[in-house]
Amino acid sequence: MCLFLCVLCVLCGVMKIAHLSDPHLTSLDPVRWRELLNKRILGYLSWRLRRRRAHSREILSRTLAHLAGQQPDHLVISGDLTHLGAASECREAETWLNRIGAPDYISIVPGNHDRYIAADPEQTLGRWRAYMQSDPDAAARGPQFPYLRVRGPVALIGLSSAVPTPPFYASGRLGEEQLQHLSHLLEATAQQGLYRIVTLHHSPHSMSSRRGLSDAGALLSTLAGPGAELVIHGHGHRQMQATLQAGARRIPVFGVPSASASYNDPAKAPGYYIYEVNKLPSGWQACAKSFILNEETQEFEQGSLGGDLTT
């Protein structure tokens, strides 16, 4: 069914949203030692011993080049651009973002690695603010998150699940205020007849308390009211797919693998997704495609993600 829908999407005028995550694109070589006198020292040692070989800028460049060939209308990055969220990393990520696209083309939500500890936002995440803010005329009011960006028939709603955590924890939390604003945005965009894509870093489905979204239940309750057409995330570094049963609603959820992974593990092969959305008189026609790097052939292989995204 999904393959059939994808064929239809190609034949019709559609909105193409690309989705990648967890590029971990930065180097820790410029990080100053005084920035490591906290939880970051553990992440730094992990990077020195293992993680710097788990992610490749060369693979990330190949992923972006292949993605560009799909000519998406918009790119969503669901967090973890950095390793430790240090100031030098955030500057490096800012330079990378400016090179690959303008803020009106790219939407970001932060990941747990981007907010590893509490830090001066102007020196860290604030550098990406242009990629994480609502349209000037959007219905969003109040804090930075959730933001609302409307592209064609699609409402892109970005949440921040990135909060500082204790050592050895990579969990996330949205908080009551953010969820209240989310409910208002979902209602407003439903009234506008938009296809609502909600993005966050952490999976809204069950994970361990050490890595999961602590208020996933509250998110589910929020979605049960006004609903959403699609929820997307990163964090897992592997292809993930589920369905949220939000009251009477069934909402598809897709988790994309890391865009730069070099684990030599087929289950964690790098790649990205494309979501194609078309507005019909009878409702929505939509499909999701995966593009995953085959480590043997070194080619990106296209697949259709299961599940019916039409409404």
Residue ranges and their predicted role:
Residues 208-281:
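Conserved beta-sheet core of the metallophosphoesterase superfamily
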Residues 91-181, 224, 247-250, 274:
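Extended active-site neighborhood of metal-dependent phosphoesterases/phosphodiesterases
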Residues 1, 5-12:
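Short, low-complexity, charge-dense intrinsically disordered segments
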Residues 19-21, 74-79, 106-112, 160, ...:
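Active-site neighborhood of phospho(di)ester-bond hydrolases with catalytic His/Asp-centered motifs
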Residues 186-207:
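Short acidic, glycine-rich surface-loop motifs adjacent to enzyme active sites
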Residues 24-28, 83-86, 112-120, 164-168, ...:
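Active-site environment of divalent metal-dependent phosphoester hydrolases
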Residues 277-311:
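A short C-terminal boundary segment appended to hydrolase-like catalytic domains
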Residues 13-92:
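N-terminal active-site segment of His-dependent metallophosphoesterases
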